[in-house]
Amino acid sequence: MEVTKGIILGEYDVIVEGEGESLDDRKSIPEILEDRGLDPKLVSSLITGPDASGTERSLLSWSEGQSDFSGEDRTLALLVHGPVDCDQLDYLLRDSHFTGVKHGVVDHNRLIECLRSQSGDIVVEQGGLSSLEGMLVARGLMYSAVYFHRVTRVTEVMLSRAVERAGDNLPDSLDLQRRVDAEIWAELDKVGGFSRDMVTRLKYRNLLKVCLSRRKEDMTQEQVERLAKAANNLAERRELEDDIAYRAGLEPGYVAIDVPSVKLLLSEPRMAQVDVKILGDDGKTRWLKEVTPMAEALRRRQVSQEAVYVMTTSGNERRVSEIAQKILFE
């Protein structure tokens, strides 16, 4: 988030040092904004929006941070971070296209036509209700089918562990932000060892296997709290992972514990916290839940069926599963 704001303000360059010489007439984002009469500071302030709470917008709670936003007219900020914002419409359509999963196809043109600003807030005209419902359903389905799919989780964990265990052998985090995927993979390959092995496995789709998973309702409160604590503490999580790996006769790193969302464990939030306002044909504004029963169904729908995954290399699933069961759940 701070990097994004820095780019808009001109405090952070997205080009690796020395590469700018190969680009002709390059303009920074603040220069482009100022050429069009826009204040970079105002634009950067919209990044955190009323629903972002000063960080990346919570994907599980639309209203988080709303009370911390000061200002009368929130229209622009809500278009960036809100119940119906440009980011959601963009990533649903884009990710649906590139993954081939059609759940994310929404009638974005109709929905945009029905967006209105009312008293500094964003509302949806009743004529766009079907399009809004379609977007909310699409969002929920995309999270289940793509973003929280177990294979997605496995690949993300493998890459994150490769970076995590590379330690100081990688360029600093700000420098990595300037790199494209291929460059980051090349850096991980140069590190060697575990990091090289993980990116090689990703390259040839020799992925880690999920050997144990649990739903929240299948765990005791003590188990839930322990997993949540470990997920929030890098050292504690790595200690658990490496303990299981050692007992299974594996090298450190070849057992991974993944908690897709700690919030799912602690408070069981739902994908659709129904804080969308509908402008009726009678001119009155109502909450979505007052207009359609679908809102309540969406609110109750869980993002991920599984609260925790334990992963390891192929051929070691049974042994790791038995050990992880004893350490984590007994």
Language-model features: where?
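Terminal helices and disordered tails flanking the catalytic cores of nucleotide-processing hydrolases
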Residues: 151, 160, 170-330
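Sequence-structural signature of the catalytic-core scaffold of metal-dependent phosphohydrolases
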Residues: 1-214
